[in-house]
A protein has these predicted regions:
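N-terminal anchoring/stem segment of glycosyltransferases
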Residues: 1-52, 62-63, 164-167
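A conserved donor-nucleotide-binding helix/loop in the catalytic core
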Residues: 43-67, 77-82, 172-173
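The conserved acidic donor/metal-binding loop of glycosyltransferases
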Residues: 68-72
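Conserved donor-nucleotide/metal-binding helix-loop-beta segment in metal-dependent transferases, i.e.
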Residues: 75-105
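Catalytic core and acceptor-binding pocket of nucleotide-sugar-dependent glycosyltransferases
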Residues: 115-213
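A short beta-strand micro-motif
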Residues: 241-245
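Basic/aromatic-rich interaction segments and small domains that mediate binding to polyanionic partners
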Residues: 250-265
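Intrinsically disordered, low-complexity, charged/polar segments
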Residues: 265-272
Length: 273
C-alpha cells in the first residue's frame, strides 16, 4: 500500500516512526528522512498552497492513500489495517466533514476566513450552475484522507474546478464528485477517525496547523450568502445555519450539535433553525 503526502514550505516536519505495511512518498521535500521517498513537484505552479494541492488532487498512483502532512504523526497500525480493509471493499473513500456544511455554509466559511473572495465564489457558483450542479445535493467532504484506486476522471475534473474556485479544495471536490457521478463510500469523520485516533471535538486530530493563510480581507458573509441564495435557489432558513460565540465573536457554521446545545446561551443565533 502506498501512503503519500504533499509538503510545501516545510510547515511541518515529516515523522520518521511510521507504521509498517506501507511505502511512504512525499512531494516537495528533497532528501527526506527514512522511510520517506521523495517525488518532484511541478515547476509551473508558484503559489505554495496550490502547489501542495497539485498531487493531492492529481494522484499519480493507481492505488494509494493520501494523508495531509499535518496529520502524519497520528498514523498507526490500526490506520494501516483500516485502509487495507477499505481498499478491499471500494475504489474510493472520503470522510464527511463533521460540520456537514451546505453549499451556502461552505462558501460563507471561505469568505469569512479570508480564503476566497466574493467575486470568485459568485462566478464559480454561476459556472457550476450552468454545468448542472445540484446545490441541494452538496456533499461536505473532509479531504485530509483520501483512499482511492484509479480515479483518473474524478481527479482531472477536480483539478479543473479547483483552479476556478479559489485556494480551498473541498468545494471543487464536491462539484467534481457529483458531476463525474463517481461511486464512493463515506463515513462520518469522527466515527472513522475514532477507529485509530481521537476525532472528538477536543481530540488530538484537530490540534494542528491548517488553513492559516489569507487571500482576501474576508469578514461578515451575510451579503454574500444573500447573493448565493438567489443564484442557487437554496432557502437560507434551511440551508444556512450560522451562529456567533458571544464571548469571542467567532462565527460557527453548519452542524454544531457536537459542540453546543440547541439553545446554548453562549451563542448568538444569526440564521437557521
Amino acid at each position: 500500500m502506498i501512503i503519500y503526502t504533499c509538503l510545501t514550505n516545510n510547515y511541518v516536519s515529516l515523522p520518521t516512526h511510521m507504521p509498517t505495511g506501507a511505502e511512504y512518498y512525499v512531494f516537495g521535500v528533497e532528501n527526506p528522512p527514512a522511510p520517506w521517498k521523495s517525488l518532484p513537484n511541478p515547476k509551473h505552479i508558484e503559489d505554495p498552497i496550490r502547489l501542495s494541492r497539485y498531487h493531492k488532487i492529481n494522484c499519480p498512483f493507481d492505488e494509494s492513500v493520501y494523508v495531509d502532512a499535518s496529520r502524519l504523526h497520528l498514523l498507526n497500525d490500526s490506520f494501516i489495517g483500516l485502509c487495507e480493509a477499505i481498499l478491499r471493499e471500494t475504489d474510493f473513500f472520503v470522510m464527511q466533514h463533521p460540520h456537514k456544511h451546505t453549499y451556502l455554509e461552505e462558501c460563507a466559511e471561505y469568505f469569512s476566513r479570508g480564503w476566497v473572495d466574493e467575486k470568485t465564489l459568485i462566478e464559480f457558483t454561476e459556472e457550476i450552475k450552468e454545468s448542472g450542479f445540484k446545490f441541494n445535493k452538496f456533499f461536505s467532504p473532509m479531504c485530509t484522507i483520501l483512499i482511492r484506486r484509479n480515479q483518473w476522471h474524478l481527479n482531472d475534473l477536480w483539478w479543473d474546478w479547483y483552479v476556478k474556485g479559489g485556494i480551498r479544495d473541498q468545494l471543487s471536490f464536491s462539484v467534481a464528485l457529483q458531476l463525474s457521478k463517481t461511486k464512493f463510500d463515506t463515513d462520518d469523520a469522527r466515527s472513522f477517525l475514532n477507529r485509530f485516533t481521537d476525532g472528538e471535538p477536543d481530540g488530538v486530530w484537530w490540534k494542528n496547523r491548517t488553513g492559516d493563510y489569507k487571500y482576501c480581507e474576508g469578514g461578515d458573509p451575510s451579503h454574500l450568502v444573500d447573493k448565493l441564495s438567489k443564484i442557487t435557489g437554496l432557502n437560507k432558513t434551511m440551508r444556512y445555519r450560522a451562529a456567533r460565540l458571544k464571548k469571542t465573536g467567532q462565527l460557527i457554521l453548519g452542524d454544531r450539535s457536537k459542540y453546543f446545545t440547541k439553545n446554548d446561551p453562549v451563542l448568538e443565533i444569526i440564521n437557521g433553525i
